Amino acid sequence: MDPGQPQPQQPPQAAQPPAPQQAAPQPPGAGSGAPGGAAQPPGAGPPPAGHQIVHVRGDSETDLEALFNAVMNPKGANVPHTLPMRLRKLPDSFFKPPEPKAHSRQASTDAGTAGALTPQHVRAHSSPASLQLGAVSPGTLTPSGVVTGPGAPSSQHLRQSSFEIPDDVPLPPGWEMAKTPSGQRYFLNHIDQTTTWQDPRKAMLSQMNVTAPTSPPVQQNLMNSASAMNQRISQSAPVKQPPPLAPQSPQGGVMGGSSSNQQQQMRLQQLQMEKERLRLKHQELLRQELALRSQLPTMEQDGGSQNPVSSPGMSQELRTMTTNSSDPFLNSGTYHSRDESTDSGLSMSSYSVPRTPDDFLNSVDEMDTGDSISQSNIPSHQNRFPDYLEAIPGTNVDLGTLEGDGMNIEGEELMPSLQEALSSDILNDMESVLAATKPDKESFLTWL
């Protein structure tokens, strides 16, 4: 409804009499004095109860649209004027952007362009990314080989050139190095009477890199670095070395060839040296194996004359000995002495006999029949069987064939005899021995 139309009036209720001051209908245009509704006379108060006038505001939509227009079209809107930024007394650094290389991280140029050293951040000398590519000393050993400053490939990352100049390097004339209470270094220039965080020795190194191709000391340094690397390679692998990696040129020792070819040559030499080391190691192992086999006693000469033992307790022990005979470290000389054990299953009971000699049983009282026998009473290395074992009845074992450094017994000569039936003589002897034993400990058998 437009504001120009007459405002509707609420009809009076029937229960109430008409008020003496009743608002009369307004003509068109009478209520246009105020944008929000009809104009009231200065002395007129609020309408009485039951005669309120309903105002329909039509300008709210236009005001909201004006707000959007002011935002979307700032030039056409009435924006209040503010003080310009130039007139606000701000420092000059507020309007000047920082230099591109002033920050330590922005100084890392992956393209490899090395510019002049510029004043950098306070902590820039300890940041690996802040060092220029040309700030490394000539002849630096890199993973791709020995390279010089100007001849370095542009694809090298700057972290390979990060370094910290030690304190023993002399300063230029007129310079002095001091440290803050926190331990940070700064440099004093007595000539200009200035103080800086930048190390003046870095500028000297950059100047040396510029004159590297025509400087004889730099060429000598490069040759020394190359010889040092070849010496380290020769110490790690004492094999015949190929020619030097980078032949020096008369102009200053600039490395020839591209970076990829150098890396391929280095990799090829490493593979050749590794192959040579493996071949030498294999030959050394073969020589050790032959030396160990020469120490083992051979049973081929005595194999046809011996008669192996076939007793009930021999099966498992002979299987163990046959397995161990293939290991040169267990049965070679004095490496393994199983004849020292007297209280375990690996004692001399491996060659069990059917009965104990009578002369040995007479000396039982004089021996310690406990579970553990001190090894100090036993010879440290028994290379022969006791003499009383030669007089044992019921066996035809040639004890001379069982003597040796490791008492090696070949499995091919023993395994067929393990399947033979036990003789009746051995069983009778075992029954007689078991029947003669008493339960008391004094007369209990002591097994060897």
From Swiss-Prot:
GO cellular component: bicellular tight junction; cell-cell junction; cytoplasm; nucleus; plasma membrane
Subcellular location, principal: cytoplasm
SMART domains: WW (SM00456)
Biased composition (Low complexity): 257-269
BP-aspect Gene Ontology terms: cellular response to gamma radiation; hippo signaling; positive regulation of transcription by RNA polymerase II; signal transduction in response to DNA damage
Chain residue ranges for the region called Transactivation domain: 251-448
A UniProt-annotated Pfam family: TEADIR3
Region Disordered, annotated ranges: 1-60, 92-112, 134-159, 228-269, 293-351
SUPFAM superfamilies: WW domain
Disulfide cysteine pairs (residue numbers): none
PTM per Swiss-Prot/TrEMBL: Phosphorylated by LATS1 and LATS2; leading to cytoplasmic translocation and inactivation.
Family stated for the protein in its record: Belongs to the YAP1 family.
Entries under PANTHER family matching the protein: TRANSCRIPTIONAL COACTIVATOR YAP1, YES-ASSOCIATED PROTEIN YAP1 FAMILY MEMBER
Protein name (database record): Transcriptional coactivator YAP1
Organism whose genome encodes this protein: Gallus gallus (Chicken)
Gene responsible for this protein: YAP1
